[in-house]
Amino acid sequence: MSSSVTSTKYVLNSFNSVPRLSYAKSIDIKDSLTDLIKIQRDSYNAFIGIDQNTESGIKNIFQSMFPIQDLLGRAVLEFVSYSIGEPQYDEYECIKRGITFSVPIRIVLRFIVWKVQEVSFKEVKYVVDEETSEKSIKYIKEQEVSIGDLPTMTSHGTFIINGIERVIVSQMHRSPGVFFDSDKGKTYSSGKLIYSARIIPYRGSWLDFEFDIKDILYFRIDRKRKLPVSLLLRALGLSNNDILDTFYDKIRYVKSEKGWVVPFVADRFRGVRLSHDLMDSDGNVLVKANTRITLRMARKLANDGLTKYLVPFNEIQGLFIANDLLDSTGNALIISAGENITSEHINKLELFNIEEIFVLNIDFLTVGPYILNTLFLDKNVSYEDALFEIYKVLRSGESPSLDTIKAFFDGLFFEKERYDLSTVGRIKLNDHLGLNVSEDITVLTKDDIIHVIKKLVLLRDGEGSVDDIDHLGNRRVRSVGEFIENQFRIGILRLERMIMDYMSSVNFDNAMPCDFVNPKVLATVLKDFFSSSQLSQFMDQTNPLSEVTHKRRLSALGPGGLTRERAGFEVRDVHPTHYGRICPIETPEGQNIGLISSLAIYARINKHGFIESPYRKVDKGVVTDKVEYLLAMQESNYYIADASATLDENNQFVDDMLYCRHDGNFVMVKREEVDYIDVSPKQIVSVAASLIPFLENNDANRALMGSNMQRQAVPLLKADAPLIGTGMESIVAAGSGTVVLAKRGGIVHRVDGLYIVIRAFDQEKNEYLGVDIYNLRKFQRSNHNTCINQRPLVKPGDYVKANDVIADGSAIDQGELALGKNVLVAFMSWQGYNFEDSIVISSEVVKKDVFTSIHIEEFECVVRDTTLGPEKIMRSVPDINEDSLSHLDDVGIVNVGAEVSAGDILVGKVTPRPPVSLPPETKLLVTIFGEKVFDCVDSSLYLPLDVEGTVVDVHVFVRRGVEENDRSLLIKQNEINGFIKERDYEIDVVSEYFYDELKRVLVSSGVQYNNQNIDDYLASIPKKEWWDINLSDEAMLLQVKDLKEKFDSMIQNAHSKFDQKIDKLNYGYDLPQGVLCIVKVFVAVKHNLQPGDKMAGRHGNKGVISRIVPVEDMPYLEDGTPVDIILNSLGVPSRMNVGQILETHLGWASVNLGKKIGHILDNLDELTVSHLRNFLYQVYDGQDLKDNIQSMSDEDLLVFAERLRDGVPMAAPVFEGPKDSQISNLLRLADLDVSGQVDLYDGRIGEKFDRKVTVGYIYMLKLHHLVDDKIHARSVGPYGLVTQQPLGGKSHFGGQRFGEMECWALQAYGAAYTLQEMLTVKSDDIVGRVKIYESIIKGDSNFECGIPESFNVMVKELRSLCLDVALKQDKDFLSNEVKD
């Protein structure tokens, strides 16, 4: 397929982001970047099928499974059609309820029972219809049957399983087909290459072929014991003669008076040293003996007319006879096929007067005797013996009949039920072996196996080369649709077996199709896959970029893939075919490095699972706009130029010679020979890496860290798009699913914090399309506890086009990805507080909540029905004073908006307890004072100790059939009010449009009523009565009638949707067994920046905040502006991520240009708009936007300039960033020093630093490694079973490890007692820590240290090595040692 290259024009409106000053030279193919999760969506759609007419995975599975008939053939169950229903609840309702977002699958089955005369164990005699001569039907029953629910993909490419969003990661695995390989000389010390071949199916047994050190060819099935390949060939039905005929050419030798006359073939004499004179058939010597003949010499002899040459009688000794040689009677065998001709055989030839023989073309140079040698290992084995030998290896211990063995062998490779190459495997096999077998034949054929052996023998003979398994032509991607299809097939096969079993025992007369199908079978298989598969992963929802990246991830791990322990360096390494397909940068840093990767920006996956990359076609040195997608295998045949190649105004290459990629190498070719050119310099990298400006100036390791850390950035309180971006920010935001995109074009009717209502309207056709209502997500919790909050960008009256961003999400600013903040940074050391990547920040940053983030914590309270009675939610909790309950409502549930802190009750709950007998004095007090005695215990939901925040939402789920409490009813009523609001919005928009249209029609009719103008008359009556006005014009009457029908239909549709929502709400909740009610409380926690939090830039420059310095102590500029962050300049040279410095300089220019524009705007009394326009010309010099600025009105120009006050947004695309001279020009334009350095003053003493400092604006991110989530305290806690040392980590409530270096520190300062305390009682001295506990209770501060348990463990380990070590504590023992 091909697409075209396009560019866009900026449109000034309130909801578009400010255009970036871009340094990109290439033109993007925008249509390839509009849908970043197309891979997931297309794969799933291919599985379910858009409609019944298209081929789909589901349809193919049903067609392959049915018809099913019983064992005796009395009845058959046929598949007619399938249908996929609508989900019961929408995506967010499923998340809220904690259920799976799924659709019901129903199939129409036809059950046919035949009329039978007689049934026996061997056969069934049917009643035959006399007219059609076919079996008579007793009856047919057709019914629609449910086979279960299928988890369905959300609009964002995810799955919601039990209320949790999950992603099915695509898997890279070895493509089905045949692969040829060698051991690279590693198996044997001699270094001899051992060649092998492997046929890998999509489903079924693997077939391996391999040589041994003696050049005998063997085969294996499923990696079992190897057998000679001649056994396999005989099992395929080939005799010895057939095998020799198949693998060797024959040479005819005709006897003459002077010797044997042989046809002369020039290629057979290449590199041969003659053992005898080369003579023609007449005996003339052409070449003397011992001469080495070259191919050129041989071909000259052929051209000179040599067609036959003479071989002396004795020179045939050592050749191999091609077939069985019989005497003239045909009874006596002289020489067997394949035998080596000896002197004895030559005498026999003379004796029997043999005039003609055929020998095998084996010269030991270009053709070796490998198949022949293998054949002689088991020369006399028959077809039956071969089958039995193969069966014995695969199924040892069994001795079945020959028919069973044949059926078993056929099922291994030749039956669709047990073996499937898949279409991909067949295509690869055909390409590799040069076959022309139909793609529909997805099992092996005899020819396939023979051709694989032939090619393997050719490899051993030195022809051809082995395959590169890491080449992307040999690896394919399995996406979500394929995984679900495989699981679906497993479930359906289980269902088929159950149907077969049921058919054998059911009475057909009473059976219906629904009796055969158990819907739980399929549901169980799908549930297991989505819940526990290695490739079904909890979605990374930290920020929009992490969502997109997770959906575009490729994993080599998982079922059928590699394991991280066995994966070598080669499979992890970057391969030349990854160019434009898999990102060479983005991969994890740990043990999964290279095994998990990301798809490149423009790459797509074709229907066979291979990755394609786009290129622009080049025709005779001219670059066209036609874009073609190429596979890795296709790409190696072409010369492909780099996107940075210089073009003239006619799109022709300027240079005569260009560097091009060809077959994995870089070569210099003429421009006329170039076939394609890259579409963009950034097509090599992934989405995350494409967001790093000046990527080309960073070391690859740091770029890897930068792309990974962007995915860890926490969405901040107020999003701020980067001043220095790459131009990909808006594309990533739109493709993430976090923003709200307009489904259709139209006019914004109403906007508030919860809804956007758009009157969908086609401006070109002037056609009304309906009403689109968008519900905005407010303060919802993501998978990683970050806050999802959508904010509208549009205002009433705005006209939006389809796919315009109408509402921002978390970490989105004006439709652009905004993961961090633009902050003023100085590169310098400061009192040692930024040593080793530590970061010093200003208190002003904390005060202004620059890096403050909101996190949503979810707490759940479950009310159960116990054996003593039901638990209850109530406000009057035992032994809790009223002040502690002030934030609860009358029911006992916390109010939304309440500020809660550690230990506060969120839900008051009591649990019944067994009755206790009260002592007499208590009974007396109860009688006198009437005190209530609680027969229950407090089991309320308390806020954990480390949480403090504001309650933002409460969900109450009451079991269907259980009486709802007041809070539950209130929440339900609020939801109903929301539905009413939506319905009324829709009716208002529909009514407004249709009444306007009706009025237009009535006014155009020109009629008058009661001598009134039509406008006045319409204003005097209710709008409902407008429809009843009589019109004399028939055409207008029909027009009004048509409007009325459309109006009624849309109003009815709005009411119908409202009723459906109410029905679903009133349906109630299905809760687990024994659960009466579930209350979920969501608390918004505010995390301010503090020491210990981790921050990073986009260039891998990460660090931990060491100190928050008062703003008055921070270094400041000449104008008094204090810097926000101080970074250590020593962190740049060794890391080689210079991109951060270039970003700093460009950011410095950007902000100061904004200040200059702001100064012009503030002084418009003195300066004119033309002055502003001229300055913007200089800023956007050479940009497409320059034309837009020229065409803007003065009013629009002022609006546009106002948005540039905080800085001019710039784009430095990957590999197309601005040059040093361009950055210098911008600094000069902003009246700055071109060095990018300024004088800084010490905030503590006010003196200027000795030398200038690099200062500028850099985009910093706050990562989700927050100190609040990591720090914890331990007094007592769990200990390890063996070592008896405290466990580690917050989740285990562990201690802090006092490690080797810490021990050195104590030793260095002579703190012996402190060191002893650390290694014993505070660690694993079991007796000592019990004693110290006792002494604390007694108030005694003294303690003794004993023997740590780790010493005892060491002693035990020494004993296991037969070394008995004992610890003596007796004083006499020491004195005896001294005496000795």
From Swiss-Prot:
SUPFAM superfamilies, alphabetized: beta and beta-prime subunits of DNA dependent RNA-polymerase
What GO terms in the biological process aspect are recorded for it? DNA-templated transcription
CDD domains in the record: RNA_pol_B_RPB2
E.C. designation(s): 2.7.7.6
> Keywords of this protein's UniProt record, alphabetized?
DNA-directed RNA polymerase, Nucleotidyltransferase, Transcription, Transferase
Q: What is the enzyme's class at the highest EC level?
A: transferase
List, alphabetically, the InterPro entries matched. Answer: DNA-dir_RNA_pol_bsu_ext_1_sf, DNA-dir_RNA_pol_bsu_external_1, DNA-dir_RNA_pol_su2, DNA-dir_RNAP_su2_dom, DNA-dir_RNAP_su2_hyb_sf, RNA_pol_bsu_bac, RNA_pol_bsu_CS, RNA_pol_bsu_protrusion
User: GO terms for CC?
Assistant: DNA-directed RNA polymerase complex
Pfam families tied to this protein: RNA_pol_Rpb2_1, RNA_pol_Rpb2_2, RNA_pol_Rpb2_3, RNA_pol_Rpb2_45, RNA_pol_Rpb2_6, RNA_pol_Rpb2_7
Q: Record keywords: Nucleotidyltransferase included?
A: yes
Task: Spell out the molecular function terms from Gene Ontology.
Answer: DNA binding; DNA-directed RNA polymerase activity; ribonucleoside binding
The UniProt record lists the keyword Cytoplasm? no
Q: Which reaction does it catalyse?
A: RNA(n) + a ribonucleoside 5'-triphosphate = RNA(n+1) + diphosphate
Assembly and binders: The RNAP catalytic core consists of 2 alpha, 1 beta, 1 beta' and 1 omega subunit. When a sigma factor is associated with the core the holoenzyme is formed, which can initiate transcription.
What does this chain do?
DNA-dependent RNA polymerase catalyzes the transcription of DNA into RNA using the four ribonucleoside triphosphates as substrates.
HAMAP family noted in UniProt? RNApol_bact_RpoB
Q: Which family does it belong to?
A: Belongs to the RNA polymerase beta chain family.
Name of this chain's protein? DNA-directed RNA polymerase subunit beta
Q: Which organism is it from?
A: Ehrlichia chaffeensis (strain ATCC CRL-10679 / Arkansas)
Give the classification, highest ranks: Bacteria, Pseudomonadati, Pseudomonadota, Alphaproteobacteria, Rickettsiales
